[in-house]
């Protein structure tokens, strides 16, 4: 489980309820976007605090470093320290590790600041779509993408922080 610092969480009950409903569905893929500093990450951390969650904060770095850091997140959550010593060269392998971990249990994969991954690799949205279609959709994983680059996130437009909608 992800450790979350004690924060006075105020409001956003409607958004939390929407996320909880999505969590109970099979094949749930959610995008949360909005301006910077409006509480997107705080909302997500509040939502995942009592769940099996893989929280990954993307940064501006080379793609191999992002894969290495996500492997570290997966290693920490699964307790499989060997994953930190593996050099992943394919995002799909990392997503398989997440899907295959305790397959009977519902999990949440959060990619926060998603646009940074796209900036590093313009093909990342199609890689993620492939991962969703081939690996994650039929597994016990809820996928949450979050970002502040509104134009990019609107293209994915699955859920807006103040106007929830569902992707079929």
Question: Where does each model-flagged region fall?
Answer:
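Conserved P-loop NTPase "ATPase switch" module shared by AAA+ and STAND
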Residues: 98, 102-124, 128
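Sensor-1/coupling segment of RecA-like P-loop NTPase cores
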Residues: 120, 130-159
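Short glycine-rich substrate-engagement loop in P-loop NTPases that contacts/grips substrate
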Residues: 77-101
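Conserved NTP-binding/hydrolysis module of P-loop NTPases
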Residues: 50-54, 64-83
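N-terminal pre-P-loop "Q-motif" helix
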Residues: 8-19
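Hydrophobic positions on the alpha1 helix immediately C-terminal to the Walker A/P-loop
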Residues: 43
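Conserved lysine of the Walker
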Residues: 40
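Single conserved hydrophobic/aromatic residue that forms the stacking wall/gate
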Residues: 159-168
């Amino acid at each position: 489980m992800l450790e979350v610092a004690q924060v006075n969480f105020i409001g956003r009950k409607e958004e939390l309820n929407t996320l909880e409903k999505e969590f109970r569905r099979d094949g749930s893929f959610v995008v949360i976007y909005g301006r910077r500093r409006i509480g997107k990450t705080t909302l997500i951390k509040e939502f995942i605090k009592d769940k099996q969650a893989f929280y990954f904060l993307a940064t501006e770095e080379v793609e191999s470093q992002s894969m290495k850091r996500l492997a570290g997140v997966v290693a920490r959550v699964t307790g499989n320290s060997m994953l930190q010593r593996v050099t992943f060269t394919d995002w799909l392998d990392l997503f398989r590790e997440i899907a295959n971990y305790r397959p009977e249990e519902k999990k949440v994969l959060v990619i926060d600041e998603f646009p940074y991954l796209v900036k590093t690799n313009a093909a990342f949205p199609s890689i993620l779509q492939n991962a969703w279609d081939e690996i994650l959709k039929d597994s016990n994983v809820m996928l949450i993408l979050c970002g502040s680059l509104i134009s990019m996130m609107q293209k994915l437009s699955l859920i807006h922080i103040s106007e929830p909608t569902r992707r079929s």
